[in-house]
Every structure is written in C-alpha cells, then in structure tokens.
Swiss-Prot record:
Sugar-bearing residue positions: 53, 86, 98, 156, 164, 176, 181, 192
Assembly information from the UniProt record: Monomer.
Phenotypic consequence of gene deletion: Leads to sensitivity to hydrogen peroxide when cells were grown in nutrient-limited conditions.
GO MF entry, a single one: copper ion binding
Keywords: Antioxidant, Cell wall, Copper, Disulfide bond, Glycoprotein, GPI-anchor, Lipoprotein, Membrane, Metal-binding, Oxidoreductase, Secreted, Signal, Virulence
Enzyme class: oxidoreductase
Taxonomic source organism: Candida albicans (strain SC5314 / ATCC MYA-2876) (Yeast)
Domain of life of the organism encoding this protein: Eukaryota
Protein name, per record: Cell surface Cu-only superoxide dismutase 5
Residue positions binding Cu cation: 75, 77, 93, 153
Gene: SOD5
Catalyzed reactions per annotation: 2 superoxide + 2 H(+) = H2O2 + O2
EC identifiers of the protein: 1.15.1.1
Pfam families given in the database record: Sod_Cu
Region annotation Disordered: where it falls in the sequence: 176-204
Length: 228
C-alpha cells in the first residue's frame, strides 16, 4: 500500500495542465506535408499559423484516407521523421507537461494530442480549421512544435503516414537551419525544486524536451524517496 501511495503521489506531482500559449503572434507559420508512400495513399497538409490572439490556427486538408479503418487519430510526435520515412522513429506523443490520454479538459491532454482536443480525422477526405491554445510557434516556448512531426493513425493505433513540421514560408529562411537553431539553444541553469525546473525548462526540439521530462521525473521520485 505504501508503494502504491508513492506511485500515485509521483504521478500527481509530475502531471499538470498545460498553460495557454499566446506567444505565437509574429512567429513564422509551420506546415506538415503528407505525401503518398508505398504503404499509404494519404496526402495533404496540416498548417499552423499565428492567430490574432497569439494562439495557433490549425488548417487540416487531407485526402486518400482508407475507407475501412477510420476514424483516424493524429498527434504531434516528439521526434522528426527520418530519411527512411519510418513513422515508428517519431516515438511518443509530444507531451511537455505530462498530460494524459482521454483527459477531461483540453489543458490536461498531451499538448500534441490534436485529435484528443479537436476530434479525429473522419472519412476519405477531410478538411477542418480550429484554434489550438496549447501548442506554440514561438521557438522559445516549451510547447514549440517546430522540428517535430505529425503521425496519422488507424483506429487501432497503427501508424499510417507521417510528416515533419517545417517552415511554411521559405522566406523566413531554410527550415532545417531554423530547426537546428532551436535545437541548439542553450540550457538554463538547474534549480532545486521540480516546480522551478518545470517553469524554466530548456528550449529545444522534442528530443531535448524528452530528456528534460525524464530528469524531472527522476527528481520528483528522488524527493519522495528521501521522505520515506
């Protein structure tokens, strides 16, 4: 019973609502371009542009979806798609605030769970637009999605197709250069409590943020262990 209590306490300490992000105004727009592959006919785009209030406007325009394995969940994943186009290499959902699946509120969802917050992709062709208050186009934000990827799943979780999130307007510069600059931004100084660590988490891409989350988890568990 003691260990169950410790586990629940650790889970509670690590999980938290994502803050509303209103820092995207003036940031470059991003896009995920889906192309047909030998295993998937899905093609189209998901665009991310700054909304007037600083949140993110999302525009989905897809076709070629299979007729018999929908509806289709889709998420921002924490790693980019490699040159091999292996969607499994994108690893887990983008989840900088340790949200949960099937959460009761949008803030409690994983930041990258677009389907959980806004509904699954439906039908063989699909178009929709919505604003998302929790992802960000600002490179300095913990919720920044540039350089990550989007994966479209079948209703059983199979990964059907995936695409990297890159700059929409090449006038802002080379997409790879921009994402690299974000990835190489310096880490901030460590602090003594997990809450302070969370509020000053380093900038960077999904790989760096996954490491930070792991360090936070280890720190909380260590504090709990010291108390028993």
């Amino acid at each position: 019973m003691k260990y169950l209590s410790i586990f629940l306490l650790a889970t509670f300490a690590l999980a938290g609502d994502a803050p509303i992000s209103t820092d995207s105004k003036g940031s470059p727009s991003l896009i995920a371009k889906f192309e047909k592959t030998s295993k998937s006919n899905i093609e189209g785009t998901i665009k991310f542009t700054p909304a007037n209030n600083g949140t993110v406007s999302v525009s989905v325009d897809l076709k070629g979806l299979p007729s018999d394995i929908g509806p289709f969940p889709y998420h921002v994943h924490e790693k980019p798609v490699p040159a091999s186009k292996n969607c499994s290499a994108t690893e887990n959902h983008f989840n900088p605030y340790n949200g949960t699946v099937r959460a009761a509120t949008p803030a409690a969802h994983e930041v990258g769970d677009l389907a959980g917050k806004h509904g699954n992709i439906m039908g063989e062709s699909y178009k929709t637009e919505y604003d998302d208050s929790y992802i960000s186009l600002n490179e300095k934000s913990r919720s920044y999605i540039g350089g990550l990827s989007i994966v479209i799943h079948a209703n059983n979780g199979t990964r059907l197709n995936c695409a990297n999130i890159t700059l929409l307007d090449e006038g802002h510069g080379n997409a790879n250069t921009t994402m690299s600059n974000s990835s190489s931004s310096s880490s901030q100084s460590a602090v003594n409590t997990s809450s302070s660590m969370a509020s000053t988490a380093p900038q960077g891409n999904g790989a760096e943020r996954a490491v930070v989350n792991g360090l936070l988890a280890a720190g909380v568990v260590g504090v709990i262990a010291a108390l028993i």
